[in-house]
Amino acid sequence: MGLKKMKGLSYDEAFAMANDPLEGFHEVNLASPTSPDLLGVYESGTQEQTTSPSVIYRPHPSALSSVPIQANALDVSELPTQPVYSSPRRLNCAEISSISFHVTDPAPCSTSGVTAGLTKLTTRKDNYNAEREFLQGATITEACDGSDDIFGLSTDSLSRLRSPSVLEVREKGYERLKEELAKAQRELKLKDEECERLSKVRDQLGQELEELTASLFEEAHKMVREANIKQATAEKQLKEAQGKIDVLQAEVAALKTLVLSSSPTSPTQEPLPGGKTPFKKGHTRNKSTSSAMSGSHQDLSVIQPIVKDCKEADLSLYNEFRLWKDEPTMDRTCPFLDKIYQEDIFPCLTFSKSELASAVLEAVENNTLSIEPVGLQPIRFVKASAVECGGPKKCALTGQSKSCKHRIKLGDSSNYYYISPFCRYRITSVCNFFTYIRYIQQGLVKQQDVDQMFWEVMQLRKEMSLAKLGYFKEEL
């Protein structure tokens, strides 16, 4: 049917004609929802239908019969049933924009010998093209001569009406996605800030942990160092105390020796009262004849002289002592000590074992010599080296077989040397001399003047002289 014939038709006639069954077309449910395929025309011309059709085509029973129908012999009643509307209505633009055409696969029509050859369905693209042509015919547009449309619509206007809706949906979707993206970016930014804050906290805690560890190690090292210093100080004080104890023991022995040696050897006799002198009774042989003749014996009194200890200082030696007293020193090269070394110390400490004697002198000078009694100590505790240098029955300095009641130790050595009482007295006399002059050097002797100090030194020299001559005192 051409468009020119439809130009003069009224609205009712055109609508009735539109309701009549059309030859060669299938039934289309115009009241169905808008087809997704038509909405997809704007987006892609090659997009295929993805939803299942919702329109069921109901062909006439005669169309399904096996008897072939001659061409151009179809009646209106033989066409597929048309959709039934409650009342005729005019489609406006809003309704057209919401119409969805669902096209199913066409059923084969029994036309003159053609139905036997159509065994396969047409593609979705062909169906879409047919549907579009049908739409263009159904809208009854008059594009050729520019006359007004019967329904006041055209394909272009329908597309224009439908396009803003799709664009609006896309814009809304784009805006929603954009908002979600912005929200996700804000959340990501917050997460990044939180991670950065936690990283700073972690770094700060790590730095504080390192500082705390370093301070703890430093404090521990400081405590260990202080403990080591205290231990070393305590050991030093203990060693000094032991040295002082040894010195005090030597001083006690020296004082005991001084007390024993200071007693007078010959007491002074006092004159008898009345001016009488003591006499000793006795008899003498009378050599003269007059004595015999007298017949009497004459008693002769024996008068003993009264003696006392006297002392006089050697001026040269006294002057040397005064010079040494002004600047006391333990250097043996000074004149005062050099004379004492030559006259008293060397002779007193000269023994047959010269090497051991030199070691004893060095220990006495350094104040590192110790003397202890043997007592009742078992022999098994005596070291082999000490036994080799002398045993309880052999003196290590003289090499003679003597009963050794004492033993000496030199410095930090672990060896002990057994000595006889004679050697012990000679060593202690020298030790007493060195102890006293050390006190003078350290300023500990304050209750005596120079003369008293000098005579005390001379008394100690006297003890050394007696010891080197063989005079000694043995403890019982």
Curated annotation (Swiss-Prot):
Residues 165-260 form a coiled coil. Keywords: Cell projection, Coiled coil, Cytoplasm, Cytoskeleton, Guanine-nucleotide releasing factor, Nucleus, Phosphoprotein, Protein transport, Transport. Residues 287-297 have a biased composition (Polar residues). Its main location: cytoplasm. It is found in: Cytoplasm; Nucleus; Cytoplasm, Cytoskeleton; Cell projection, Lamellipodium. Phosphorylated by AKT1; the phosphorylation alters its GEF activity. This is Rab-3A-interacting protein. It comes from Homo sapiens.
